[in-house]
């Protein structure tokens, strides 16, 4: 019984706020579940690409043009490195400063940038540079994220690269202008070279898959809101 000097509890504002909050939190949780399914399918596709037999550059290019995800597609081709135009990208090597070595190559009518792997800083001027036609095997990488917020500007003239800019790299390569620019970087497989340096990394995706954790968080907040609202009601 409510005494004359007491005000009735304001139930409806709490109910309305709870319903609105639950709708938002459940929607966000459901969206993360959908994103989880999409990300798992994408990662499965990348794994299938990496496990499939290698194809030549033109076949991989046509796959991408037809709408297939060509990331991590394995390629094998014969190409000739332009060793006087190698590029260095600031990187790390075994917890210390290192470099990623990129070498332009001409192959099958394409101008290709090949990621040959990493080396420690002290080996920058002393690494293997194979001459003549080479059997090259690697995986395709789009590297399309562009310049990060804190990344310095690339310096092609000073051969100092901080982020991936494939058109600029091909332009700086000095390869013949009649070669078609290949729209992917070819990352060498460790099994494709016997050189000590540069040393290729095992190809792996840098795609994060945190959607399950996010979904649990949103649904957990929805349950918490429901419990708190029930306590006050």
Model-derived segments and spans:
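Surface-exposed, charge/polar-rich loops and edge strands
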Residues: 1-233
């Amino acid at each position: 019984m409510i005494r004359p000097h007491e005000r009735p509890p304001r139930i409806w504002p709490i109910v309305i706020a709870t319903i609105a909050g639950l709708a938002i939190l459940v929607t966000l949780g459901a969206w993360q579940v959908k994103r989880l399914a999409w990300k798992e399918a994408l990662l499965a596709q990348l794994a299938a690409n990496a496990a499939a037999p290698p194809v030549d550059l033109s076949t991989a290019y046509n796959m991408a043009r037809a709408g297939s995800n060509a990331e991590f597609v394995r390629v094998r081709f014969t190409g000739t490195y332009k060793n006087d135009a190698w590029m260095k990208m600031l990187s790390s090597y075994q917890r210390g400063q290192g470099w990623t070595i990129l070498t332009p190559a001409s192959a099958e009518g394409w101008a290709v940038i090949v990621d040959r792997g990493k080396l420690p800083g002290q080996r920058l001027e002393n690494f293997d540079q194979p001459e003549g036609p080479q059997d090259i095997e690697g995986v395709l990488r789009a590297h399309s994220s562009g310049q990060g917020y804190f990344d310095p500007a690339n310096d092609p003239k000073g051969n100092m690269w901080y982020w991936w800019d494939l058109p600029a790299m091909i332009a700086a390569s000095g390869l013949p202008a009649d070669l078609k620019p290949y729209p992917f970087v070819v990352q060498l497989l460790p099994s494709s070279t016997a050189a000590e340096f540069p040393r290729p990394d095992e190809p792996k995706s840098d795609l994060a898959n945190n959607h399950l954790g996010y979904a649990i968080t949103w649904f957990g907040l929805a349950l918490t809101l429901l419990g708190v609202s029930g306590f006050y009601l």
